[in-house]
Amino acid sequence: MTELNAGNAASFRDQVRAALVEAQNNIDIDLSQVEFVDSAGLGSLVALRKTACERNGKVRLINPSPHVQQILELTRLHRVFEIVRL
């Protein structure tokens, strides 16, 4: 996926939630191929963080592209999510 936007954000969120097994607390999301994210995409990431927090877990955003990293910083979400560079 190269974009996380209003057209696919709800589907993305639902697919990630469906893939979670009961004992899984943490969610790792590879953003290395995502070049664009809008407010709906950010909302889906925040919703997944809420899901993880309800399980006493966290969301890690893996290798966000420079543009996505900039959006995370502009929205201050880089303070909410753990950003991991591998």
Role assignments for model-derived ranges:
Residues M1-D14:
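STAS-typified acidic loop motif
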Residues R17-D38:
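Short, glycine-/small-residue-enriched flexible loop/hinge segments at domain edges that mediate gating
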Residues A19, L48-A52:
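Hydrophobic helix-cap positions at the C-terminus of alpha-helices
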Residues Q33-F36, S44-A47, Q70-E73, V80:
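Residue-level recognition of specific faces of alpha-helices
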Residues T51-R85:
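C-terminal structural segments of small proteins and small subunits
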